[in-house]
Protein backbone atom coordinates (compact mmCIF):
# COMPACT_ATOMS: atom_id res chain seq x y z
CA UNK A 1 0.00 0.00 0.00
CA UNK A 2 1.31 3.43 -0.93
CA UNK A 3 0.38 6.34 1.33
CA UNK A 4 -0.32 9.08 -1.20
CA UNK A 5 -3.22 11.05 0.29
CA UNK A 6 -1.26 13.75 2.11
CA UNK A 7 -1.73 17.45 1.42
CA UNK A 8 1.96 18.08 0.78
CA UNK A 9 1.84 21.46 2.50
CA UNK A 10 5.64 21.63 2.82
CA UNK A 11 5.91 21.34 -0.97
CA UNK A 12 3.82 24.42 -1.72
CA UNK A 13 3.46 26.09 -4.19
CA UNK A 14 3.88 22.88 -6.25
CA UNK A 15 1.06 21.19 -4.35
CA UNK A 16 -1.30 24.10 -4.96
CA UNK A 17 -1.96 22.57 -8.37
CA UNK A 18 -1.02 18.89 -8.09
CA UNK A 19 -0.86 16.15 -5.44
CA UNK A 20 2.42 15.36 -3.72
CA UNK A 21 2.37 11.94 -5.38
CA UNK A 22 2.74 13.58 -8.79
CA UNK A 23 5.55 15.97 -7.88
CA UNK A 24 8.33 15.11 -10.36
CA UNK A 25 11.86 14.10 -9.45
CA UNK A 26 14.22 13.73 -12.41
CA UNK A 27 11.23 13.86 -14.72
CA UNK A 28 9.19 11.15 -13.01
CA UNK A 29 6.37 11.58 -10.48
CA UNK A 30 7.02 10.22 -6.99
CA UNK A 31 4.17 7.79 -7.57
CA UNK A 32 5.89 6.32 -10.61
CA UNK A 33 9.20 6.01 -8.80
CA UNK A 34 7.55 4.17 -5.91
CA UNK A 35 5.50 1.83 -8.10
CA UNK A 36 8.56 1.04 -10.23
CA UNK A 37 10.51 0.12 -7.10
CA UNK A 38 7.72 -2.19 -5.96
CA UNK A 39 7.40 -3.77 -9.39
CA UNK A 40 11.13 -4.45 -9.64
CA UNK A 41 10.89 -6.28 -6.31
CA UNK A 42 8.16 -8.57 -7.64
CA UNK A 43 5.06 -6.81 -6.36
CA UNK A 44 2.30 -7.12 -8.93
CA UNK A 45 -0.48 -5.45 -6.92
CA UNK A 46 -0.69 -2.19 -4.99
CA UNK A 47 -3.25 -0.07 -3.19
CA UNK A 48 -2.99 3.73 -3.30
CA UNK A 49 -4.96 5.98 -0.98
CA UNK A 50 -6.02 9.33 -2.42
CA UNK A 51 -7.42 12.61 -1.06
CA UNK A 52 -5.68 15.79 -2.24
CA UNK A 53 -6.25 16.16 -6.02
CA UNK A 54 -7.49 12.56 -6.06
CA UNK A 55 -8.79 12.93 -9.62
CA UNK A 56 -5.34 13.80 -10.92
CA UNK A 57 -3.81 10.70 -9.34
CA UNK A 58 -6.54 8.51 -10.84
CA UNK A 59 -6.07 10.14 -14.24
CA UNK A 60 -2.33 9.53 -14.09
CA UNK A 61 -2.79 5.88 -13.10
CA UNK A 62 -5.31 5.36 -15.89
CA UNK A 63 -2.86 6.78 -18.41
CA UNK A 64 -0.09 4.26 -17.68
CA UNK A 65 -0.12 1.30 -20.06
CA UNK A 66 1.70 -0.90 -17.55
CA UNK A 67 -0.95 -0.33 -14.87
CA UNK A 68 -4.34 -2.00 -14.58
CA UNK A 69 -7.04 -0.49 -12.37
CA UNK A 70 -9.30 -3.55 -12.33
CA UNK A 71 -8.50 -7.19 -11.42
CA UNK A 72 -8.03 -9.33 -14.51
CA UNK A 73 -7.70 -6.32 -16.79
CA UNK A 74 -4.50 -6.93 -18.70
CA UNK A 75 -2.02 -9.75 -18.23
CA UNK A 76 1.44 -8.65 -17.19
CA UNK A 77 0.28 -5.28 -15.92
CA UNK A 78 0.52 -4.11 -12.34
CA UNK A 79 -2.84 -3.97 -10.59
CA UNK A 80 -3.23 -0.68 -8.71
CA UNK A 81 -6.45 -0.19 -6.77
CA UNK A 82 -7.50 3.15 -5.32
CA UNK A 83 -8.67 3.59 -1.75
CA UNK A 84 -10.78 6.74 -1.87
CA UNK A 85 -10.42 9.27 0.96
CA UNK A 86 -11.79 12.25 -0.97
CA UNK A 87 -14.35 13.11 1.71
CA UNK A 88 -11.89 13.16 4.59
CA UNK A 89 -8.21 12.48 5.10
CA UNK A 90 -8.14 9.50 7.47
CA UNK A 91 -4.50 9.68 8.57
CA UNK A 92 -2.24 6.69 8.16
CA UNK A 93 -3.91 4.21 10.51
CA UNK A 94 -7.39 5.04 9.32
CA UNK A 95 -6.13 4.70 5.75
CA UNK A 96 -5.08 1.10 6.35
CA UNK A 97 -8.46 0.15 7.83
CA UNK A 98 -10.30 2.01 5.08
CA UNK A 99 -8.42 -0.12 2.53
CA UNK A 100 -9.20 -3.34 4.39
CA UNK A 101 -11.11 -4.97 1.54
CA UNK A 102 -7.98 -4.81 -0.61
CA UNK A 103 -5.57 -6.01 2.10
CA UNK A 104 -7.22 -8.78 4.10
CA UNK A 105 -6.29 -12.32 3.20
CA UNK A 106 -2.91 -11.41 1.71
CA UNK A 107 -0.83 -12.61 4.66
CA UNK A 108 1.53 -9.64 4.77
CA UNK A 109 1.50 -6.30 3.01
CA UNK A 110 4.08 -3.57 2.66
CA UNK A 111 3.40 0.09 3.45
CA UNK A 112 5.49 2.70 1.62
CA UNK A 113 5.23 6.48 1.90
CA UNK A 114 5.10 7.96 -1.59
CA UNK A 115 7.62 10.67 -0.70
CA UNK A 116 10.37 8.30 0.44
CA UNK A 117 13.19 7.40 -1.95
CA UNK A 118 15.64 4.80 -0.69
CA UNK A 119 18.16 2.14 -1.61
CA UNK A 120 16.29 -0.44 0.48
CA UNK A 121 16.16 -3.92 -1.02
CA UNK A 122 12.48 -4.73 -0.49
CA UNK A 123 13.08 -8.45 -1.09
CA UNK A 124 15.58 -8.39 1.77
CA UNK A 125 13.13 -6.50 3.97
CA UNK A 126 10.32 -8.98 3.36
CA UNK A 127 12.69 -11.81 4.29
CA UNK A 128 13.29 -10.21 7.71
CA UNK A 129 9.65 -10.57 8.82
CA UNK A 130 9.34 -12.88 11.82
CA UNK A 131 6.42 -15.32 12.08
CA UNK A 132 5.13 -13.66 15.28
CA UNK A 133 5.40 -10.07 14.02
CA UNK A 134 2.28 -7.97 13.85
CA UNK A 135 4.38 -5.35 12.08
CA UNK A 136 7.98 -4.91 10.99
CA UNK A 137 9.42 -1.39 10.73
CA UNK A 138 12.45 -0.46 8.65
CA UNK A 139 14.72 1.75 10.76
CA UNK A 140 18.29 3.00 10.70
CA UNK A 141 20.85 4.67 12.93
CA UNK A 142 20.75 8.19 11.55
CA UNK A 143 20.22 11.71 12.86
CA UNK A 144 16.59 12.63 13.48
CA UNK A 145 14.50 14.70 15.86
CA UNK A 146 12.23 11.73 16.58
CA UNK A 147 13.28 8.20 17.40
CA UNK A 148 11.66 4.85 17.95
CA UNK A 149 12.94 2.92 20.96
CA UNK A 150 13.70 -0.80 20.77
CA UNK A 151 14.83 -3.52 23.13
CA UNK A 152 18.45 -4.15 22.12
CA UNK A 153 18.23 -7.95 22.34
CA UNK A 154 14.90 -8.51 20.59
CA UNK A 155 14.44 -5.34 18.49
CA UNK A 156 10.89 -5.17 19.82
CA UNK A 157 9.34 -1.69 19.78
CA UNK A 158 8.99 -0.27 23.30
CA UNK A 159 8.70 3.48 22.86
CA UNK A 160 9.18 6.76 21.04
CA UNK A 161 10.87 10.05 21.80
CA UNK A 162 11.03 13.55 20.39
CA UNK A 163 14.42 15.06 21.16
CA UNK A 164 13.31 18.59 20.29
CA UNK A 165 10.33 18.69 22.66
CA UNK A 166 11.44 16.12 25.21
CA UNK A 167 8.24 14.13 24.71
CA UNK A 168 8.61 10.46 25.63
CA UNK A 169 6.23 7.51 25.22
CA UNK A 170 7.14 4.15 26.71
CA UNK A 171 5.42 0.76 26.54
CA UNK A 172 5.40 0.52 30.33
CA UNK A 173 7.22 1.35 33.58
CA UNK A 174 9.65 -1.51 32.97
CA UNK A 175 11.15 0.26 29.95
CA UNK A 176 14.29 2.30 30.60
CA UNK A 177 14.98 4.82 27.88
CA UNK A 178 18.73 4.77 28.46
CA UNK A 179 18.86 1.02 27.79
CA UNK A 180 16.99 1.21 24.48
CA UNK A 181 18.25 1.47 20.94
CA UNK A 182 17.24 4.80 19.41
CA UNK A 183 16.57 4.39 15.70
CA UNK A 184 14.88 6.53 13.07
CA UNK A 185 11.85 5.27 11.16
CA UNK A 186 12.04 5.17 7.37
CA UNK A 187 8.38 5.38 6.35
CA UNK A 188 8.54 1.77 5.09
CA UNK A 189 6.97 -1.05 7.08
CA UNK A 190 5.32 -4.45 6.71
CA UNK A 191 2.11 -5.53 8.42
CA UNK A 192 0.57 -8.93 8.95
CA UNK A 193 -3.03 -8.85 7.78
CA UNK A 194 -3.94 -9.88 11.34
CA UNK A 195 -3.30 -6.24 12.17
CA UNK A 196 -6.64 -5.31 10.61
CA UNK A 197 -8.72 -6.88 13.40
CA UNK A 198 -6.41 -5.42 16.04
CA UNK A 199 -6.67 -1.97 14.46
CA UNK A 200 -10.45 -2.18 14.30
CA UNK A 201 -10.68 -3.09 17.99
CA UNK A 202 -8.19 -0.36 18.88
CA UNK A 203 -10.15 2.28 16.98
CA UNK A 204 -13.51 1.24 18.41
CA UNK A 205 -12.41 1.06 22.04
CA UNK A 206 -10.83 4.52 21.78
CA UNK A 207 -13.70 6.18 19.96
CA UNK A 208 -11.68 6.84 16.82
CA UNK A 209 -14.52 6.15 14.39
CA UNK A 210 -15.78 9.49 13.12
CA UNK A 211 -18.73 7.73 11.47
CA UNK A 212 -20.06 4.20 11.94
CA UNK A 213 -17.58 2.82 9.41
CA UNK A 214 -14.85 5.45 9.13
CA UNK A 215 -11.87 5.42 11.53
CA UNK A 216 -9.27 8.19 11.71
CA UNK A 217 -5.94 7.84 13.54
CA UNK A 218 -2.17 7.82 12.90
CA UNK A 219 -0.55 4.43 12.48
CA UNK A 220 2.34 5.36 14.79
CA UNK A 221 -0.09 6.07 17.63
CA UNK A 222 -1.48 2.59 17.06
CA UNK A 223 1.98 1.01 17.14
CA UNK A 224 2.96 2.81 20.33
CA UNK A 225 -0.33 2.04 22.05
CA UNK A 226 -0.23 -1.67 21.21
CA UNK A 227 3.46 -2.55 21.36
CA UNK A 228 3.12 -3.75 24.96
CA UNK A 229 0.62 -6.38 23.78
CA UNK A 230 1.88 -7.34 20.32
CA UNK A 231 5.24 -7.99 18.73
CA UNK A 232 6.14 -4.98 16.63
CA UNK A 233 9.75 -5.28 15.54
CA UNK A 234 12.33 -3.03 14.02
CA UNK A 235 14.68 -4.10 11.27
CA UNK A 236 17.85 -2.05 11.08
CA UNK A 237 19.60 -1.65 7.75
CA UNK A 238 23.15 -0.44 8.33
CA UNK A 239 23.60 0.73 4.75
CA UNK A 240 20.16 2.32 4.34
CA UNK A 241 20.19 5.61 2.47
CA UNK A 242 17.01 7.58 1.94
CA UNK A 243 15.60 10.95 1.05
CA UNK A 244 12.32 12.26 2.41
CA UNK A 245 11.01 14.39 -0.45
CA UNK A 246 8.90 16.50 1.86
CA UNK A 247 10.22 20.00 1.25
CA UNK A 248 11.13 22.08 -1.78
CA UNK A 249 14.80 22.09 -0.85
CA UNK A 250 14.90 18.28 -0.93
CA UNK A 251 13.94 18.02 -4.60
CA UNK A 252 17.47 18.71 -5.81
CA UNK A 253 18.87 16.34 -3.19
CA UNK A 254 16.43 13.68 -4.40
CA UNK A 255 17.54 14.10 -8.02
CA UNK A 256 21.18 13.61 -7.06
CA UNK A 257 20.23 10.64 -4.88
CA UNK A 258 18.49 8.86 -7.77
CA UNK A 259 21.73 9.01 -9.76
CA UNK A 260 23.39 6.84 -7.11
CA UNK A 261 20.84 4.01 -7.22
Write out the residue ranges for each language-model feature.
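Glycine-rich N-terminal loop/short-helix segment of MobA-like nucleotidyltransferase
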Residues: 1-26, 37-41, 236
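Short beta-strand-to-turn element immediately C-terminal to the catalytic PLP-Schiff-base lysine
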Residues: 25, 149-152, 245
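Conserved N-terminal catalytic core of the sugar/cofactor nucleotidyltransferase
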Residues: 2, 24, 28-113, 124, ...
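A generic "binding-loop/recognition-motif" signal
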Residues: 7, 18, 53, 86, ...
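Catalytic-core segments of class I nucleotidyltransferases/pyrophosphorylases
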Residues: 110, 117, 123-130, 142-143, ...
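Conserved beta-strand segments of alpha/beta enzyme cores
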Residues: 21, 79-81, 231-233
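A short, conserved acidic/glycine-rich loop-to-beta-strand motif
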Residues: 132-141, 146
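Conserved beta-strand termini and adjacent loop/short-helix elements that scaffold enzyme active sites
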Residues: 83-85, 138, 235-238
